[in-house]
């Protein structure tokens, strides 16, 4: 029996689901139990346009595990920024998200190929919806 794949879902996929982009909701449901990072929560709340949207995001995320920052995630994110920020345009929060997936042994689900595709050690899946 093989272990189920553990997924860390990136901000773009969650935004697609919140906006009811065709296929995004079923894709998330197909993952089973998935998690999101504190960096993803920060991006979502930063992009909220009202308190109503903040409450909707909180409610939507409440059933899922949030992976919090750790010292190891911070150190790995720093290494990722130093190595990939210029050639691939990987930003600070994307580096934290990638580091979270690597440290937790998870597969990152994201449509953002440019920022994540070359990061060494990152298991990466591009949703097809």
Q: What is the meaning of each model-derived region?
A:
Residues 25-29, 114-121:
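Short loop/helix-cap segments at secondary-structure boundaries that form the rim of catalytic
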Residues 11, 38, 93-95:
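Conserved glycosyltransferase catalytic-site signature
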Residues 2-5, 66-114:
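Active-site neighborhoods of divalent-metal-dependent phosphate/nucleic-acid chemistry enzymes
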Residues 1-36, 45-59:
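Short, well-structured N-terminal submotif of metal-dependent ribonuclease cores
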Residues 38-40, 70, 112, 128:
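Residues at the C-termini of beta-strands that transition into short coil/loop
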Residues 14, 41-44, 74, 116:
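A generic structural signal for short hydrophobic patches within well-formed alpha-helices
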Residues 121-129:
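Short beta-strand->loop
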């Amino acid at each position: 029996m093989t272990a189920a794949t553990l997924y860390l879902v990136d901000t773009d996929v969650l935004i697609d689901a919140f906006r009811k982009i065709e296929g995004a909701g079923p894709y998330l449901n197909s993952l089973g139990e998935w998690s999101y990072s504190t960096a993803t929560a920060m991006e979502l709340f930063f992009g909220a346009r009202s308190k109503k949207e903040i409450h909707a995001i909180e409610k939507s995320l409440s059933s899922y595990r949030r992976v919090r920052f750790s010292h190891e995630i911070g150190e790995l994110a720093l290494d990722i920024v130093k190595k990939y920020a210029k050639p691939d345009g990987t930003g600070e929060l994307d580096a934290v998200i990638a580091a979270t997936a690597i440290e937790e042994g998870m597969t990152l689900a994201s449509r953002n190929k440019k920022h994540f595709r070359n990061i060494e050690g990152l298991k990466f899946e591009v949703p097809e919806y």
